[in-house]
A protein has these predicted regions:
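Selective transmembrane helix interface/packing segments
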Residues: 1-361
């Protein structure tokens, strides 16, 4: 398995040795390069996910989807982006302009920081703390502040109702996500994402060696993650039939585009975290006793494994969205507090018991 830290160490040595940069200059240059990489990946994956969403939706509805702009409609997303860039940004007269303009940037910032937590390959992790899981959960909650500010500052009752729904929904379902992650922390014994992936590379994917509690945690995570992203059938904060467009009703132009961008990147982040915690992240598929097969799997780059697993989970989440009908807000909160939270707590105890008794593969 290729270790990407070789490249980062070479770059640091090149900047300090060949280019003659001081320590602070080399670190500053590396930080700028990393920021450019994050922004580029952010844009590329957003475009890919929007196109994938339209094609998957069309598949489930027996349609073709975008087919006119470019070959197989590939350029449709770019035309939509161009249209959004040329639209005027309009603000309501009675709205709080400062908070109204600040809210979309808070949502995108939270999405970018959590996007940087994903371990792309062995040695290729931008943010890697020994409490990485807690940091991820803390940063992901910043987006709630942006949504609440958007609803309140718009001076629109529909926006405010959508923001309050979204805040209640996201805060509620964070409990289930946190407890499913705690179950996997019990299994791996660490909160660092790089160490979680390394542990699965050596001992097998968590969903395979964690027995039934790991499978239950994975299913709960899929449901809670879908609700966390405000996607169907949990898209009550922006349901068109009731609230026009929810908390971003009064947004236009690229301010609306930021919310659209953050929604799809949050979907990718949710799926990427599922592949990291449960499916090994960049760790390849290994089958005990088949050394030749395992050697071939190790040749495939870790980034390919990670992106492939992530898009598989993205497809599962899109499948959920276009299959199930929308729930009412009371049904959504009842599902979390009456079912998912108790199941998550019991499942966490079961996982701790399995680890304590050594009942893992």
């Amino acid at each position: 398995m290729f270790d990407f830290s070789i490249v980062t160490n070479w770059l640091h040595t090149f900047l300090m040795g060949t280019c003659g940069f001081a320590e602070w200059g080399a670190i500053l240059t590396e930080s700028i390069l990393v920021a450019l990489v994050i922004i580029t990946l952010y844009a590329v994956f957003a475009i890919a996910l929007i196109y994938m969403e339209r094609k998957v939706c069309a598949f489930f509805q027996c349609r073709l989807g975008p087919m006119r702009v470019g070959k197989w409609g590939i350029l449709q997303v770019f035309s939509d982006v161009f249209k959004m860039l040329t639209k005027e940004i309009i603000s309501m007269r009675q709205s709080d302009l400062f908070l109204h303009n600040l809210a979309p940037f808070l949502v995108v910032t939270a999405s970018m920081v959590t996007f940087a937590c994903l371990p792309w390959n062995k040695g290729a992790h931008i943010i890697d703390f020994n409490v990485g899981v807690f940091f991820f959960l803390a940063m992901s909650s910043i987006g709630v502040v942006g949504i609440l500010l958007a609803g309140w500052s718009s001076n629109n009752k529909y926006s405010l109702i959508g923001a309050m729904r979204s805040g209640a929904q996201i805060i509620s379902y964070e409990l289930s996500i946190g407890m499913t992650m705690l179950a996997m922390i019990c299994l791996t014994g660490t909160m660092s994402f790089s160490e979680i992936c390394n542990d699965q590379y050596l001992n097998g994917w968590n969903i395979c060696r964690g027995h039934i509690p790991a499978v239950i945690a994975f299913l709960i995570y899929l449901v809670a993650g879908n609700a966390e992203c405000n996607r169907g059938p949990f898209d009550l904060p922006e349901c068109e039939s009731e609230l026009t467009a929810g908390y971003h009703t009064e947004y236009s132009g690229m301010h609306f585009g930021y919310y659209y961008l953050a929604e799809y990147l949050n979907l990718f982040i949710c799926a990427g975290m599922a592949s990291t915690i449960f499916l090994g992240g960049w760790a390849p598929l290994h089958i005990y006793g088949l050394d030749a097969f395992n050697g071939v799997m190790d040749v495939i780059p870790g980034a390919v494994w990670f992106i492939g697993k992530t898009f598989f989970v993205v497809f599962l989440l899109m499948w959920l969205r276009w299959t199930f009908p929308r729930l009412r807000i009371d049904q959504i909160l009842s599902l979390e507090w009456k079912y998912l939270v108790p199941f998550s707590m019991v499942n966490l105890v079961l996982m701790a018991l399995c680890v304590a008794m050594g009942w893992t593969f």
